[in-house]
Amino acid sequence: HHTKFIAKQEGRNLKYIKKCFHVPLKGPDFETLKILKLIAKNNIVLNTGHLSAIETLILVKYAKKLGVKKILVPANNFDIATISKLKQFKVVFEFSYFFISRAINIPLTHVDGEKHKITGTNENKLKELIKEAEPKNVILSSDSGVSVLPLPHLSFYKFIKIIINFGFSKKEINYMIKINSKNLFNL
């Protein structure tokens, strides 16, 4: 948090929105390029954060050109076409319980005292997104560090039960909750 994309969703004022991070259509600005070069040089993970689909595609394209090898993309609100395009760059997709939980219906604070609702997704769409991304490219998380949800480990347990009900195998779930994270972060 905080990007122009999210600030616009939250209905923030224009003065606030202008100060937020974004990736221009022409490509990342000089400061962002410097950060991408540092990430590449140190072989650390780039988390693209809460950007729009087009911003994420642009950022990932530039990151790969600069040698960034490990990219984590929060993808709960993307469509199948965006997931398909991002797969070409060999990113890891993150899907979290938060975006299908009741927390999306409750105004919450994130970066300041203002309360806003977050755009979520539904379980059917989530299942299709994970299928498109493919379990070997997915990390599941609870993202449950808000007071209206159960403790993160309990939320994660609930999320895993939902994923099991989607029909993913134990092997696929093992990739999504353990193996992919270990590989991405060299653990």
Task: Enumerate the language-model features and the residues they cover.
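His/Asp/Glu-enriched short active-site or ligand-binding loop at hydrolase and phosphoryl-transfer sites
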Residues: 92-104
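Mid-to-C-terminal alpha-helical segments outside catalytic/metal-binding sites
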Residues: 153-187
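Divalent metal-coordination and catalytic microenvironments
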Residues: 46, 93, 143, 173, ...
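Divalent metal-binding pocket/active-site signature
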Residues: 1-80
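Acidic (Asp/Glu)-rich catalytic clusters
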Residues: 36-40, 64, 83-90, 127-135
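Histidine/acidic-residue-rich catalytic or RNA/ligand-binding cores of hydrolases
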Residues: 57-61, 82-86, 103-126, 146-160
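Short acidic/histidine-rich active-site segments
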Residues: 135-151
